[in-house]
Swiss-Prot record:
The lineage of its organism: Bacteria, Bacillati, Cyanobacteriota, Cyanophyceae, Synechococcales. InterPro entries: Chaperonin_Cpn60_CS, Cpn60/GroEL, Cpn60/GroEL/TCP-1, GroEL-like_apical_dom_sf, GROEL-like_equatorial_sf, TCP-1-like_intermed_sf. This is Chaperonin GroEL. Together with its co-chaperonin GroES, plays an essential role in assisting protein folding. The GroEL-GroES system forms a nano-cage that allows encapsulation of the non-native substrate proteins and provides a physical environment optimized to promote and accelerate protein folding. ATP binds at residues 29-32, 86-90, 413, 495. Keywords: ATP-binding, Chaperone, Cytoplasm, Isomerase, Nucleotide-binding. GO terms for molecular function: ATP binding; ATP-dependent protein folding chaperone; isomerase activity; unfolded protein binding. Belongs to the chaperonin (HSP60) family. It comes from the Bacteria.
């Protein structure tokens, strides 16, 4: 494939063109008065979106070089999304502003490498400043504010996420499902929940709701397939004497053993239910061990030299309550805090050590199941298009609240970055010189871009608003939805520090790369050759 090679100013200008196109498409969504973007889908209805990274992923340009610019800026958005889960539009607007400002200097003959060094130093200074200004999230009101701002000023959603976090803890899982009704609802399960239900419907204790509910049961946890009922008899006899129900969690229970359990259950001899173990392979064993720790029992496995037929009552787990439906099992246990805490710390260490994002996600799920329970938000909407938009907004809101809990909150609405601009200029003048100083000043000038854009989307003059904000104290800024200057914390317009920091770092990193570009190599589009004129009657329009 032949290549096109473009050098110097031409290369940078071509990248800039692509960056302009993407930044403009994404920037229209910024702020409380930001508009939506409609995306055409190859199949199904068009999607109406207000989420920066989703829009960025859809944009592909015909010109290969301009498309390279789009791909670079898209990276700033998706990296921010990966790190903080929100702030993608801010990252795009910032990167665009730094590139525009920087290219002017490079065109005027500045040394791009020194500019990059200045940009990097400025970014490090700003990250420290953001950390020092961040306030820890103390109460559910702050969490609700962060969630509401991220979901596009939907305070009902913010409150719902705050309630969910209250119930499942800061590390609990909040998952999203498409609901069946018009309203968005929150469903919380306390304790540990995994997605395997009873093996046979005959185990249901409540036939109307088709669920099995046991109070104060014993739990037999094993990674074996149970084929012979003789293996179970010693345990069943001990449990029957104790007069408490039994829940068996095993890899599988085969026909003969299952039939015996069902018959005993129906005759009222023994209150019992059997559930298949969750997960697969090594992960299954780890999850069974988690359940054993949670319930204060032992995993009966031949790896540890333990056999079913010699199992004693004190090796079984105990729970306050177990609810089993056809699809999932919820265990509410208590009294094993020390063991659970040790197990949680162990999983946390594994999360830190693992490189794979898939493993990280699965470990995070295990951590959440152990440490807090699960909240499910069922997203409701009138149409599928609205449902998809709400789901994306909710996802942003959940990510933003988790980020806020991690690193605290700062004034929102572009205010923090705008206030840091004069501080950066002051610091840079005192500590940097020459073109490094110019690099830091490029960042300082770009910092007001998100605030300007929020004001412009609200129909006002961005430059005037940003100058006014710079004169105010740090906690005060511009409330675009009510068109007034307010204390951002009091008004509840806050951003997670992690989101602001990630957006800034990723924007500066990508922009610095664009400024130091001196040559672009892209594929040359191949002209399609038409068939020769005499290629059969009426066949000349086909490509060969």
């Amino acid at each position: 494939m032949a290549k096109r090679i473009i050098y110097n100013e031409n290369a940078r200008r071509a990248l800039e063109k692509g960056i302009d196109i993407l930044a403009e498409a994404v920037a229209v969504t910024l702020g409380p008065k930001g508009r939506n973007v409609v995306l055409e889908k190859k199949f199904g209805a068009p999607q109406i979106i207000n989420d920066g990274v989703t829009i960025a992923k859809e944009i592909e340009l015909e010109d290969h070089i301009e498309n390279t610019g789009v791909a670079l800026i898209r990276q700033a958005a998706s990296k921010t999304n990966d790190a903080a889960g929100d702030g993608t539009t801010t990252a795009t607007v910032l990167a665009h502003a730094v590139v525009k400002e920087g290219l002017r200097n490079v065109a005027a003959g500045a040394n791009a490498i020194l500019l990059k060094r200045g940009i990097d130093k400025a970014t490090n200074f700003l990250v420290e400043q953001i950390k020092s200004h961040a306030r820890p999230v103390e109460d559910s009101k702050s969490i609700a504010q962060v969630g509401a701002i991220s979901a596009g000023n939907d305070f009902e959603v913010g409150q719902m996420i705050a309630d969910a976090m209250d119930k499942v803890g800061k590390e609990g899982v909040i998952s999203l499902e498409e609901g069946k009704s018009m309203t968005t609802e929150l469903e919380v399960t306390e304790g540990m929940r995994f997605d395997k239900g009873y093996i046979s419907p005959y185990f249901a204790t409540d036939t109307e709701r088709m669920e099995a509910v046991f109070d104060e049961p014993f739990i037999l946890i094993t990674d074996k397939k149970i084929g012979l009922v003789q293996d179970l008899v010693p345990v069943l006899e001990q449990v029957a004497r104790a007069g408490r129900p039994l829940v068996i969690i095993a890899e599988d229970i085969e026909k003969e053993a299952l039939a015996t359990l069902v018959v005993n259950r129906l005759r009222g001899v023994l209150n019992v239910a059997a559930v298949k173990a969750p997960g697969f392979g090594d992960r299954r064993k780890a999850m069974l061990e988690d359940i054993a720790v949670l319930t204060g029992g032992q995993l009966i496995t031949e790896d540890a030299g333990l056999k079913l037929d010699t199992t004693k009552l004190d090796q079984l787990g105990k729970a306050r309550r177990i609810t089993i439906t056809k699809d999932n099992t919820t265990i509410v246990a208590e009294g094993n805090e020390a063991a659970v805490k040790a197990r949680v710390d162990q999983i946390r260490r594994q999360i830190e050590e693992t490189e794979s994002s898939y493993d990280k996600e699965k470990l995070q799920e295990r951590l959440a199941k152990l440490s807090g329970g699960v909240a499910v938000v069922k997203v409701g909407a009138a149409t599928e298009t609205e449902m998809k938009d709400r789901k994306l907004r909710l996802e942003d809101a959940i990510n933003a609240t988790k980020a806020a809990v991690e690193e605290g909150i700062v004034p929102g609405g572009g205010t923090t970055l705008a206030h840091l601009a004069p501080q950066l200029e002051e610091w840079a003048t005192a500590n940097l010189s020459g073109e490094e100083l110019t690099g830091a000043q490029i960042v300082a000038r770009a910092l007001t871009a998100p605030l300007k854009r929020i004001a412009e989307n609200a129909g006002l003059n961005g430059a005037v608003i940003s100058e006014r904000v710079k004169e105010l104290p740090f906690d005060e800024g511009y409330d675009a939805s009510n068109n007034q200057f307010v204390n951002m914390f009091t008004a509840g317009i806050v951003d997670p520090a992690k989101v602001t920091r990630s957006a800034l770092q990723n924007a500066a990193s990508i922009a610095a790369m664009v400024l130091t570009t001196e040559c672009i190599v892209v594929d040359k589009p191949e002209p399609k050759e038409k068939a020769p004129a005499g290629a059969g009657g009426g066949m000349g329009d086909f490509d060969y």
